[in-house]
From Swiss-Prot:
PANTHER family: THIAZOLE SYNTHASE (PTHR34266:SF2). 1-deoxy-D-xylulose 5-phosphate binds at G162, A189, G190, N211, T212. The active site is at K101 (schiff-base intermediate with dxp). This is Thiazole synthase. One of its GO terms (molecular function) is thiazole synthase activity. One of its GO terms (cellular component) is cytoplasm. Belongs to the ThiG family. It is an enzyme of class 2 (transferase). It is found in: Cytoplasm. Its main location: cytoplasm. InterPro entries: Aldolase_TIM, Thiazole_synthase_ThiG, ThiG. It catalyses: [ThiS sulfur-carrier protein]-C-terminal-Gly-aminoethanethioate + 2-iminoacetate + 1-deoxy-D-xylulose 5-phosphate = [ThiS sulfur-carrier protein]-C-terminal Gly-Gly + 2-[(2R,5Z)-2-carboxy-4-methylthiazol-5(2H)-ylidene]ethyl phosphate + 2 H2O + H(+). Its EC number is 2.8.1.10.
Length: 264
């Protein structure tokens, strides 16, 4: 499992291990308050959903700028390599960043990443100087192929986007973390509760990226704070070292010094 103490992505250090999406909020104000409560250093946003070119009077864009967070544009909704590469290139020009959350969707039903298109697009973008953070499944071979083409971060899903199902395949996620020890890995998508984020961090994952679980909560800022606390707690638990599970009970109270008649 990852022994990295600092949260470092492409050579850049971050204080928070929480990456928050900016879509689906009922209002820009709720989004701003949620970003603040999340204590995040990175926010994701999609070029297709916003038009930052029109910045005058754009409340959304102004709030994003005021947050001071690093921008992580995404290629959400892209279904082909060409489409994803083109959108990434446009995002670099508009948002003035070479960071990109790469998404190539292969199925409309569960929004599962297209593994073949994802690897191809990642290779193209990395050759163009992009810092690619690929949204992928928990498939070990896919993750290895992404590393082979130059990705320095992996973002496997916990469950399909927006489902709130949590960590559906714990075996795969644990195996992935154990097999790929020294690469930052962020659980991206599918989480619905802070407890699920804490569990992922306890497994040794380096960070959490989510959107819907906060944006669709009854109180998004409070939920953002809850996730931030859970992520911190999960990381502390991982660093502390969890006890091993046992099949039999073991008393936690010592018997030394008890009266002799106790055993009669």
């Amino acid at each position: 499992m990852s022994q990295t103490k600092d949260f470092v992505l492409y050579g850049e250090h971050f204080n928070s291990r929480f990456l928050l999406g900016t879509a689906l909020y009922a209002s820009p104000q709720l989004m701003r308050d949620s970003i603040e409560k999340s204590r995040c250093d990175i926010v994701t946003l999609g070029l297709r959903r916003q038009n930052p070119a029109n910045r005058d009077g754009d409340t959304f864009w102004q709030y994003i700028q005021d947050s001071g967070c690093r921008l992580l544009p995404n290629t959400a909704g892209c279904k082909s390599v060409k489409e994803a590469v083109t959108l990434a290139e446009m995002s670099r020009e508009i948002f003035d960043t070479d960071w990109i959350k790469l998404e190539v969707v292969g199925d409309d039903y569960n929004l599962q990443p297209d593994p073949f298109g994802l690897v191809e697009a990642a290779g193209i973008l990395i050759k163009q100087g992009f810092k690619v953070l690929p949204y992928c499944t928990d498939d070990l071979i896919l993750c290895k192929r992404l590393l082979d083409v130059g990705c320095q971060v992996l973002m496997p899903w916990g469950a399909p986007i927006g489902t709130g199902q949590g960590l559906l395949n714990r075996y795969n996620l644990r195996s992935l973390r154990e097999r790929i020890k020294d690469v930052p890995m962020i659980i991206d998508a599918g989480l619905g509760a802070p407890s699920q984020a804490a569990e992922a961090m306890e497994m040794g994952y380096d960070g959490i990226l989510l959107n819907t679980a906060v944006a669709k909560a009854h109180n998004p800022p409070l939920m953002a704070e809850a996730f931030a606390d859970a992520i911190d707690a999960g990381r502390k638990a991982y660093n502390a070292g969890l006890m091993q599970k046992r099949q039999t009970a073991s008393p936690s109270t010592p018997t030394l010094g008890q009266p002799f008649w106790h055993n009669q």
